[in-house]
A protein has these predicted regions:
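ATP-dependent carboxylate activation and anion-phosphoryl transfer catalytic cores
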Residues: 1-206, 214-215, 272, 279-286, ...
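Compact, charge-rich alpha-helical regulatory domains located at protein termini
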Residues: 170, 209, 223, 717-719
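Acidic/histidine-enriched active-site and ligand-binding environments that engage anionic O-linkages
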Residues: 429-439
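ATP-binding N-terminal substructure of ATP-dependent carboxylate-amine bond-forming enzymes
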Residues: 120, 242-413, 422-429, 648-806
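Acyl-CoA thioester-binding alpha/beta core of soluble enzymes
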Residues: 194-197, 229-251, 256
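Extended, domain-scale alpha-helical bundle/helix-rich regions
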Residues: 211-214, 220, 224
Length: 807
C-alpha cells in the first residue's frame, strides 16, 4: 500500500479475538473523521506519498517539528454522532443495520467521554440538551426493556433511560451488547442528571462545577436543579489545543476544543500571536467570527460549507482574522488551516459565548451557515456583538409571518393569503377562511421540514398531528393558500443600496414541489420579459426595505402572468454555489465585501440583473430512497433529496440530458415486451395523455390502474388495466417483479402513511430499482429526453472555468 488504507475490524467483546471485515486501499469516509479527530492530515500525506515522498520526508504541519511517521497521540476523547433524517421522515423505518442511513454527522471533543457525548447530543440539533428523550420517559420499565431490543436511531436514549431507572447493567448488556465501559460512562451522566434533579432549588458550587466538567449547559443545570441563579455567573470554559502529540512537543496549530478542566491554551496562543505581530510592527487585524452550518442534513447540506469557506477566504484576503466555529468533520471549514483559528464546538449560545470571551471578536457573520447560524443571530444581537451584514431584526422580519405581511404591504408586493395558527381548531378555521388546498409548515424551518399541502380537512387534521408531535410549538404553524404556477428563485447580493442578481432560476416542477427537489434551470426558460422585470423590481424592493447587506434569497410563484412572493431569506441559500459556478459571479466574495462596507458599483459586476451566461445549466436532484425504508418517494413541499448534479450545455435539452444521466436516470431502448405503469391522480390525468401517447409511439406497452387506464383508453391511448397493490394476483406487484417495467409514473394519493397503496407501489419500485416518476413536469422532461436521438457523445463538453476567465 502506498497512500491511504481503510481497515474495518470486528472485535470479540469478551476477548482479544478479532476478524477483518473489509480492507479498502484508499481514503474513506472515516479518513476525514480520523483527520479531524487527530489533527493528522491523512489525504494530504497520502497525496505526497503518491508523488514520491516517504513518511520520514513529510513534515507534520501541526507541530512543524515532527515528521509524518510519528503516529498521533491524543489526550482527549472524540465522539462522532450520526445525523439521521428521521426528524423529516416521521413514518420512515428507523431500524439501523448494515446499510448506512445517516445523511451527515457531528464530531465533539472533550476531556472525558461524558463531556464529548453531551457536546455531540447538543450538536446534532434534535432539541435535546441531555440524553433524556421525552417519549421514553412516558414508558413503563417493562416497555423500556422491550424497546432495548430495538436497534434503531433512538437506542442510545433508551439505554440512558434504562440506566436512569436503575435497570441493571447486566440486563442492558445482554440485550444490546453495548460494552460495559460505555454503560458505566452513561450511568455516570444519568447519576449526575438525577443528582441535579434532586437539588430542589439549592445547588452547591461543587455540584455545579462537576456538572460543567461533564458537559451540562447552564440552561440545563438551571432547569434540572430548578434554580434561577447559578453559584458562579459567567463561568467560562477554557480551550485546549488539538496538537497530534498529547503536548509532547510544542505545536502551532490554531485548532481548539472547550473544556472546564485546565488552562486556556487558546488565550495563550492568541496572546503569543498578537505579541509577535506587535513586535513586527503589524497593525492589529479585525477579528470576525464565522459560524458554520453543523451536520449535513436534508435541506442544509454541503452548500452552506461552500459559503462559509468562501466567506473565510474573502475575509482573510481583506485583512481580517477569520475565526471558524463548526462541529462537522466532513467539511472543508473544519480543516485546521482554512481559517485563522478553528473551534470545534457545538453551535449553541453558551458555546459561542465561551469562544467570544476568549477571542473578543469585533464582529460575527451568520448569513453563510444556513438556519443553524441564523438561529444564533438573535443571541448575538442580545449580547451586543455586531453582525456583519443584514441585522438580526431584518432576519426576524423575514421569518415572522405578521411582520413579513407588514413588509409586503409596505413594498406593495402580492402574496398568497395566509394565516398563523397555534392549534388544530385555528388551523381548521384558517383553512375554511382562505380555502383548500393550503400549504402548511412550521415557521423557522429549512428544507421544508414538516411542510405539506393539505387538500382536505382530513389532511389538515393529520398534518397538525404530525407537526405538533415532531416540532417545538413555541413557534406557530403557517397556512398559505396554495397557488399552482411556475416557481422561480433568485439569489441577490446587496450593499444596502444597490443589488445584483446573477441570474433567475426556474423550477421545472410547478409550485407544490420543494425547490430543492425540483429540476432547476438557469437561465429561466419560460418567463416573459414583463415577468422578469417584475421579479427584478420586487427583489430590489425587498433588499432595500430589509436593509439587506450581503445575500438574500427570494422564491416566487408565477401564475397567469402575476408574480407572487413565496418567501424571503436574508441569508445564503443552497443555490448559491450553483448560480455562482454557472454565471461566473463569485457571489460569496461580493457579499462579504458588501458586509465589509464596499459598494457593488465598484466591484466590476454591475448592478440589477446580470447578463445571462452563454450556456444553459440544469440542476437535477439526487435521492437516497433505497436507503430509507418506508419513505414515500412522492414529491411535495417537504424536501427529500440528499444531493444534486449539474448538467451544462449550449441548450436546455442537452443540459437536461446531462443532468438526468448524472443523477442516475437510465435511458433504455424499449424491448418487444417493455412496459410502463401509470397510476395518476385525477387532476394530472389530462396532462398524462400526451406523455402516455409519446411512450406508446416509442414502442412501450402501457399499463394503468383502473381509473388511469379508463382515462387513457377514453382518450385513444391504448392501455391495459392492472390490479392495484391490494388486488388479487396477478396484480401490479407481479408486473413490477416481472422485469419488464422500465418506468413507473405515480402521482396519486399524496400522503406519508406507508400503508397506502400508492406509497407501497412507489416503495416497491424503489426496491426493484425501477425509475419512479412522481411529478407531471419531471415526466415530461424525462419523456422528451427519451424521444430525442441524442446521446452523451453528441453533446459538447463545457468548461465553466471559462466563465470566470472572461471577467
Amino acid at each position: 500500500i502506498e497512500g491511504g488504507c481503510n481497515c474495518q475490524f470486528a472485535l470479540k467483546p469478551d476477548s482479544f479475538d478479532y476478524a477483518v471485515i473489509e480492507v479498502n486501499p484508499r481514503v474513506s469516509r472515516s479518513s476525514a473523521l480520523a483527520s479531524k479527530a487527530t489533527g493528522y492530515p491523512i489525504a494530504k500525506v497520502a497525496t505526497k506519498i503518491a508523488i514520491g515522498y516517504t513518511l520520514d520526508e513529510i513534515t507534520n504541519d501541526v507541530t512543524g517539528k515532527t515528521c509524518a511517521c510519528f503516529e498521533p497521540a491524543l489526550d482527549y476523547i472524540v465522539v462522532k454522532y450520526p445525523k439521521w433524517p428521521f426528524d423529516k421522515f416521521v413514518y420512515a423505518d428507523k431500524s439501523l443495520g448494515t446499510q448506512m442511513m445517516a445523511t451527515g454527522e457531528v464530531m465533539s471533543i472533550g476531556n472525558s467521554f461524558e463531556a464529548a457525548m453531551m457536546k455531540a447530543v447538543s450538536s446534532i440539533e434534535l432539541g435535546m440538551d441531555t440524553l433524556t428523550h421525552k417519549p421514553f420517559e412516558e414508558l413503563t420499565d417493562d416497555e423500556i426493556v422491550a424497546h432495548l431490543h430495538v436497534q434503531d436511531a433512538e437506542r442510545v436514549f433508551c439505554v440512558y433511560e434504562a440506566l436512569k431507572r436503575g435497570i441493571d447493567h447486566e440486563t442492558i448488556w445482554k440485550i444490546t451488547k453495548i460494552d460495559w465501559w460505555f454503560l458505566d460512562k452513561m450511568q455516570h451522566l444519568a447519576d449526575l442528571e438525577k443528582g441535579l434533579a434532586k437539588c430542589n432549588g439549592v445547588l452547591s458550587l461543587e455540584q455545579y462545577q462537576t456538572a460543567k466538567k461533564y458537559g451540562f449547559q447552564d440552561k440545563t443545570i438551571k432547569r434540572l436543579a430548578q434554580v434561577d441563579a447559578l453559584p458562579v455567573e459567567n463561568y467560562r470554559a477554557g480551550f485546549k489545543m488539538v496538537d497530534t502529540c498529547a503536548a509532547e512537543f510544542s505545536a502551532n496549530t490554531p485548532y481548539f476544543y472547550s473544556t472546564y478542566d485546565g488552562d486556556n491554551e487558546a488565550a495563550e496562543f492568541i496572546a503569543a500571536r498578537e505579541a509577535e505581530a506587535a513586535a513586527n510592527g503589524q497593525p492589529k487585524k479585525k477579528k470576525v467570527l464565522v459560524f458554520g452550518s453543523g451536520p449535513i442534513r436534508i435541506g442544509q447540506g454541503i452548500e452552506f460549507d461552500y459559503c462559509s469557506v468562501h466567506c473565510v477566504w474573502t475575509l482573510k484576503n481583506h485583512g481580517c482574522e477569520a475565526i471558524l466555529v463548526n462541529n462537522n468533520p466532513e467539511t472543508v471549514s473544519t480543516d485546521f488551516d482554512t481559517g485563522d483559528r478553528l473551534y470545534f464546538d457545538p453551535l449553541n449560545p453558551e458555546s459561542v459565548d465561551n469562544i467570544i470571551a476568549t477571542e473578543k471578536p469585533d464582529a460575527c457573520v451568520v448569513q453563510f451557515g444556513g438556519q443553524t447560524a441564523i438561529k444564533l443571530a438573535k443571541h448575538m444581537d442580545e449580547i451586543g456583538l455586531p453582525i456583519l451584514g443584514t441585522p438580526a431584526d431584518a432576519i426576524d422580519e423575514a421569518e415572522d409571518r405578521e411582520r413579513f405581511d407588514e413588509l409586503l404591504e409596505r413594498c406593495k408586493i402580492p402574496r398568497a393569503p395566509g394565516r398563523t395558527v397555534f392549534n388544530l381548531e385555528e388551523a381548521l378555521a384558517a383553512a375554511d377562511e382562505i380555502g383548500l388546498p393550503v400549504l402548511m409548515r412550521p415557521s423557522y424551518v429549512l428544507g421544508g421540514q414538516n411542510m405539506i399541502v393539505a387538500y382536505t380537512k382530513a389532511d389538515v387534521i393529520e398534518y397538525m398531528g404530525v407537526i405538533t408531535e415532531h416540532v417545538d410549538m413555541d413557534h406557530p404553524v403557517l397556512l398559505d393558500k396554495y397557488i399552482m404556477g411556475t416557481e422561480c428563485e433568485v439569489d441577490a447580493i446587496c450593499d444596502g443600496e444597490n443589488f445584483l442578481i446573477p441570474g433567475i432560476m426556474e423550477q421545472v416542477e410547478r409550485t407544490g414541489v420543494h425547490s430543492g427537489d425540483s429540476i432547476c434551470v438557469y437561465p429561466a426558460q419560460h418567463l416573459t420579459q414583463a415577468e422578469i422585470d417584475t421579479i427584478v423590481d420586487y427583489t430590489g424592493r425587498f433588499a432595500r426595505e430589509l436593509h439587506v447587506t450581503g445575500l438574500v434569497n427570494v422564491q416566487y410563484a408565477v401564475s397567469n402572468g402575476k408574480v407572487y412572493v413565496i418567501e424571503v431569506n436574508p441569508r445564503s441559500s443552497r443555490t448559491v454555489p450553483y448560480i455562482s459556478k454557472v454565471t461566473g459571479v463569485p457571489m460569496v466574495d461580493l457579499a462579504v465585501r458588501c458586509c465589509l462596507g464596499e459598494k457593488l458599483a465598484d466591484m466590476g459586476y454591475g448592478t440589477g440583473l446580470h447578463p445571462n451566461a452563454p450556456y444553459v445549466a440544469v440542476k437535477v436532484p439526487v435521492f437516497s430512497f433505497e436507503k430509507l425504508h418506508g419513505v414515500d418517494t412522492q414529491f411535495g413541499p417537504e424536501m427529500k433529496s440528499t444531493g444534486e448534479v449539474l448538467g451544462i450545455a449550449p441548450n436546455f435539452h442537452d443540459a437536461l440530458l446531462k443532468g438526468l444521466i448524472g443523477a442516475g436516470y437510465t435511458f433504455k431502448t424499449p424491448g418487444p415486451a417493455s412496459c410502463c405503469i401509470f397510476t395518476v391522480k385525477d387532476s394530472d390525468k389530462p396532462e398524462f395523455v400526451d406523455i402516455a401517447w409519446k411512450l406508446k409511439n416509442m414502442g412501450y406497452k402501457l399499463y394503468g390502474t383502473s381509473g388511469t387506464c379508463a382515462w387513457l383508453n377514453k382518450h385513444m391511448v391504448p392501455c391495459n388495466e392492472v390490479r392495484n397493490m391490494s388486488g388479487e394476483a396477478p396484480n401490479i406487484v407481479d408486473l413490477l417483479q416481472s422485469g419488464l417495467v422500465d418506468y413507473v409514473f405515480s402521482t396519486s394519493a399524496k400522503g406519508r402513511d406507508p400503508k397506502r397503496d400508492s406509497v407501497r407501489l412507489r416503495r416497491k419500485a424503489v426496491e426493484l430499482s425501477i425509475p419512479c416518476i412522481t411529478a407531471v413536469d419531471t415526466a415530461n422532461a424525462l419523456v422528451n429526453c427519451l424521444r430525442s436521438d441524442h446521446s452523451m457523445k453528441d453533446i459538447p463538453l463545457v468548461d465553466i472555468a471559462t466563465l470566470y476567465h472572461k471577467k
